[in-house]
């Protein structure tokens, strides 16, 4: 019984930590996108968009 409780606690802990790490990789401004692409275009709804060449 204790083993099941420990497994539940570990799974809850993992479920709360993983989204926090993902949120840190999302952008708040265009400056945050510079680590993902050389020419950042914009940050929209937490997603980085890079400028593309017309070639």
Swiss-Prot record:
Native source species: Olivierus martensii
Record carries keyword NADP: no
GO cellular component, one term: extracellular region
Main localization, broad class: secreted
UniProt tissue specificity: Expressed by the venom gland.
Keywords: Amidation, Disulfide bond, Ion channel impairing toxin, Neurotoxin, Potassium channel impairing toxin, Pyrrolidone carboxylic acid, Secreted, Signal, Toxin
Modified residues (Threonine amide): 53
Protein name as catalogued: Potassium channel toxin alpha-KTx 17.1
Function as written in the Swiss-Prot or TrEMBL entry: Blocker of potassium channels, which inhibits both the delayed rectifier and fast transient potassium current. The inhibition is reversible and voltage-independent. It causes a depolarizing shift of the steady-state activation curve of the currents, without changing their steady-state inactivation behavior.
Similarity section: Belongs to the short scorpion toxin superfamily. Potassium channel inhibitor family. Alpha-KTx 17 subfamily.
Highest taxon of source: Eukaryota
Positions carrying Pyrrolidone carboxylic acid: 24
Signal peptide range in chain numbering: 1-23
Intrachain S-S bonds: 27-43, 33-48, 37-50
Note on domains (UniProt): Has the structural arrangement of an alpha-helix connected to a beta-sheet by disulfide bonds (CSalpha/beta).
Record's subcellular location: Secreted
Gene Ontology MF term list: potassium channel regulator activity; toxin activity
């Amino acid at each position: 019984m204790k083993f099941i409780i420990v497994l539940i606690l570990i799974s809850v802990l993992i479920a709360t930590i993983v989204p926090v790490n993902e949120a840190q990789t999302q952008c708040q401004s265009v400056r945050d996108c510079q680590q993902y692409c050389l020419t950042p275009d914009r940050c929209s709804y937490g997603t980085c968009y890079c400028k593309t060449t017309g070639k």
